[in-house]
């Protein structure tokens, strides 16, 4: 069974649904790529997924080794490049 079901809503927007929970996320193309920039862009979600995965893995390791792991966050900077348009760099800074 699929994990995520995504549908195109038109106007460069999509809706991704986590099938098991029913939680939904809307994406919108950014202003600099013909969108309205009213929601996460697909590449924003990619970088958010990376940082969420990193913090989750750190949390699992901390729990496994009885290390306090609270009030931890990170800032993510996504740097786009052209020709072809793509994510060129992702910078993750942890606040611990």
Give the residues covered by each predicted segment.
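Extended beta-strand/beta-hairpin segments
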Residues: 1-48, 59-96
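Alpha-helical metal-binding/catalytic segments enriched in His/Glu/Asp
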Residues: 53-54
């Amino acid at each position: 069974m699929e994990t995520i079901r995504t549908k195109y809503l038109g106007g460069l927007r999509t809706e991704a649904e986590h099938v098991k929970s029913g939680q939904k996320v809307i994406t919108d193309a950014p202003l600099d790529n013909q969108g309205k920039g009213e929601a996460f862009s697909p590449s924003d979600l990619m970088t958010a997924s990376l940082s969420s995965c990193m913090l989750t893995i750190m949390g699992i390791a901390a729990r496994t080794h009885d290390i306090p792991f609270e009030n931890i966050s990170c800032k993510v900077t996504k740097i786009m490049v052209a020709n072809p348009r793509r994510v060129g760099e992702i910078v993750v800074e942890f606040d611990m």
